Amino acid sequence: MSKVHVFDHPLIQHKLSYIRDVNTGTKEFRELVDEVGMLMAYEVTRDLELQDVDIETPVTKMTAKRLAGKKLAIVPILRAGLGMTDGILSLVPAARVGHIGLYRDPETLKAVEYFAKLPQDITERQIIVVDPMLATGASAIEAITSLKKRGAKNIRFMCLIAAPEGVEKMHEAHPDVDIYIAALDEKLNDKAYITPGLGDAGDRLFGTK
């Protein structure tokens, strides 16, 4: 069964309060999402493997630690997931970035993939799928399903806020995928918006509301 990691770090919660605030403008919203993405990435990458390397400092020779094992790939779900990507890249600049685009079918209400561009060695990488919100879970589930169909195995999902309904659906669909969130909100409303939530993350990031 997948685990849900909820971050209670004071800096994350402080910045999240401004992200939620309806009075926060597009520029500040974008900067805050980027910053929280970076802060969350510290914890999401906590268990990356290290290996010993011999180096020489200006004073003496020593054995130091560097990242080893599987390389990292970040896969934002278009378009809102783009807002969290640069924050992670600021910590792990060598990571590759893939993209998955989804839209909701107006009749079936299911998420349908319309675009996917991934690193060629995606099967060999540890993957962080990013999207600011986990509401119904449909988009995240479809994105992860798409990655698995392409051979990806080591996948994590990272978002700012989640609804219990979305978390439950993710557990059912992908019990092997851990979920990392800044806040677990109360519920979905009758329009499938997370409550209290932050509104439409894509519109607020790109000023299109």
Curated annotation (Swiss-Prot):
5-phospho-alpha-D-ribose 1-diphosphate binds at residues 79, 104, 131-139, 200. It comes from Staphylococcus aureus (strain NCTC 8325 / PS 47). Binds 1 Mg(2+) ion per subunit. The magnesium is bound as Mg-PRPP. Pfam families: UPRTase (PF14681). HAMAP family: Upp_B. This is Uracil phosphoribosyltransferase. It comes from the Bacteria. Catalyzes the conversion of uracil and 5-phospho-alpha-D-ribose 1-diphosphate (PRPP) to UMP and diphosphate. NCBIfam families: PRK00129.1 (NF001097), upp (TIGR01091). Uracil binds at residues 194, 199-201.
